[in-house]
Amino acid sequence: MNLKPLADRVIVKPSPAEEKTKGGLYIPDSGKEKPQHGEVVAVGPGKAADNGTVVAMEVQVGQKVLYGKYSGTEVTVDGEDYLIMRESDIFAIIG
């Protein structure tokens, strides 16, 4: 991947959507929920504060995160799907 996020943006690789239900039924593509968790693959340098200093990012590459269902912008690079979102769109770090 050749993407470098700017400011307080984060690039997340969404986890794969569930293929089947707990009961063993396969879910068609039209019925799959968008994943709300994934792995951080790149982070920007941070957001500039009003006084000009850069506030460091809390999330780091490799962390698993939870985010809103409609958070971020979907992009495809080299056949892989990613989300670009602001750090504030991330609700929690898993683990």
Swiss-Prot record:
Query: Key word Cell division present in the record?
Result: no
* Annotated stretches, region: Disordered: 12-38
Tell me where it resides: Cytoplasm
GO biological process terms on file: chaperone cofactor-dependent protein refolding
Record's GO cellular component terms? cytoplasm
Keywords of this entry: Chaperone, Cytoplasm
Recorded hits in Pfam families, A to Z, give: Cpn10
Give the record's family classification: Belongs to the GroES chaperonin family.
Annotated function: Together with the chaperonin GroEL, plays an essential role in assisting protein folding. The GroEL-GroES system forms a nano-cage that allows encapsulation of the non-native substrate proteins and provides a physical environment optimized to promote and accelerate protein folding. GroES binds to the apical surface of the GroEL ring, thereby capping the opening of the GroEL channel.
Please describe the quaternary structure of this protein: Heptamer of 7 subunits arranged in a ring. Interacts with the chaperonin GroEL.
Return the HAMAP family for the record: CH10
Annotated protein name in UniProt: Co-chaperonin GroES
Lineage of this protein's species?
Answer: Bacteria, Pseudomonadati, Chlorobiota, Chlorobiia, Chlorobiales
